[in-house]
Amino acid sequence: MQLRASVLLSFLGLASVGHAGNVENNHNVCTVRANGGHQDDVPNIMAAFKECGNGGTIIFPEDQSYWIATRLHPTLKDVAIEWRGKWTFSDNLTYWRNNSYPIAFQNHHAGFIISGDNITINGYGTGGIDGNGNTWYTAEKGDTQPGRPMPFVFWNVSEVIVDSFYVKDPPLWSVNIMNGTNMRFNNIYCNATAVDAPWGDNWVQNTDGFDTMDATNIQLTNFVYQGGDDCIAIKPRSYNIDIQNVTCRGGNGIAIGSLGQYLEDSSVANIRVDKVNIIRYNEDMHNSAYLKTWVGALVPQSSYESAGVPRGDGWGSIRNVLFSNFNVQGASAGPSISQDSGDNGSYAGTSKMSISNVAFVNFTGWVDTEKSVVSTVSCSEVHPCYNIDYDNVVLYPGKNATTAGTGSCKYTADGGVHGLSGC
């Protein structure tokens, strides 16, 4: 009787070594080699995820550069990914506009989505994703259009570790968690730079660094961001988020929100953000730490992020938030609260989101303003905010100012703001 090699190996108790294109499977360890040039590597990558994505190891070697020309969405379980090489998204804008995975939230799209459980990704300081975003930035020149693919999205995941990884020039948000539980990120670097933009022009809107939504028990440490939007954004239904050691260069700083854009509960609770450097870059650094919610009415919107339909009127609460140890170098504003997103001038103070138990602790540095007010608290007349604490917040209105700035408040509960001069 003649036996095939794979059958004979099974009789001998040995695992076979398989090859599928540029994928080598050695005892449930899949090593993926790039095709080279601008040949699509996604078929080989998906083959590796299929062969070794359940209880195995997947390796992208450091000397390999992969061309991502088509969308991909693997579901993985009990897998370790040694991501030492670089993925580069193709510059085929037409393909991505027409084929990226639609994300209902804010009319966005994704090019690469990971789902599953017990996933470890290590970039070892060399691995990551180049989103080829400069092609988009130059084409749109600051007027973001639908269809840009988010390059690194976690959707329906749990027990995830990501270490020593980068996302360079994302077309849209860099790292996005949507329905994730028990996730740890460490040594993450995100950079969105429009090399063709005139100095002072922001062509990299919507290139958030790290966003969470429907997320619980998320830890982020040692994070560096350069871009033109939220460095970090804590979005609806995020709970138990712990963030430490962050540097934000340019953009909007650390955001809670925006919340209440949709007719749903957008609550957020138990957030700590500690040890943050906020650095002005490209004449752009709008905020340092801020909370933003929508008005309590459906208001017509023209932006693509609202899909051109009325938005707002969401509800919920923001509670137990700590921002501490911020060094602010040239942001346009100090810590702030604004509950009038989406307003057309008729609905100020109507937000249905309540805000309480928020602390800003140990803020130092300067704010790029000619006014004396460096921090504003503008809450909701429907739910006046309370237990808003400022503790050792000393920010100067200008780099050479000698007198610390003050604050302004409205729609707050009586005695609801403590420690902010002017309130």
Swiss-Prot record:
Domain of life assignment: Eukaryota
Catalysis performed (reactions): [(1->4)-alpha-D-galacturonosyl](n) + H2O = alpha-D-galacturonate + [(1->4)-alpha-D-galacturonosyl](n-1)
Signal sequence segment: 1-20
Molecular function (Gene Ontology), one example: galacturan 1,4-alpha-galacturonidase activity
The protein's Enzyme Commission number: 3.2.1.67
GO cellular component terms given for this protein: extracellular region
Record keywords, A-Z: Carbohydrate metabolism, Cell wall biogenesis/degradation, Disulfide bond, Glycoprotein, Glycosidase, Hydrolase, Polysaccharide degradation, Repeat, Secreted, Signal
Role, per record: Specific in hydrolyzing the terminal glycosidic bond of polygalacturonic acid and oligogalacturonates.
Protein name per Swiss-Prot or TrEMBL: Putative galacturan 1,4-alpha-galacturonidase C
Species, as recorded: Aspergillus niger (strain ATCC MYA-4892 / CBS 513.88 / FGSC A1513)
